[in-house]
Amino acid sequence: MVSFDPQLGVLRVSGDEDASTVSYRRRPLSTALRATRDVVVDLSGLRFADSTLMLDLAVLAQRLRKRGRTLRLRGARPQVRFLIEQMGLDRQPAVMLEVLA
């Protein structure tokens, strides 16, 4: 499940996100594109993700960058963080992966 709070600039991603949930992500991702601040992606509730979510977040980051904004990835569990790193999302310009110690 993906939702966006425009007042806080937080995109919350929870549960399982894969190719079968792509259509449900479109509206919150589109809303996040219009953010007037940097966007924080709260991944703390995400149990499973595949490459489709990472690609959607990469596109969001590219579009936000064109508007002078950044995408901050926060609260990723180890397996999700591994996928972020494998897909290279954390190396994209304007993407910051916040890792808890």
Roles of regions detected by a PLM:
Residues 1-52, 58-101:
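STAS-like cytosolic regulatory interaction modules
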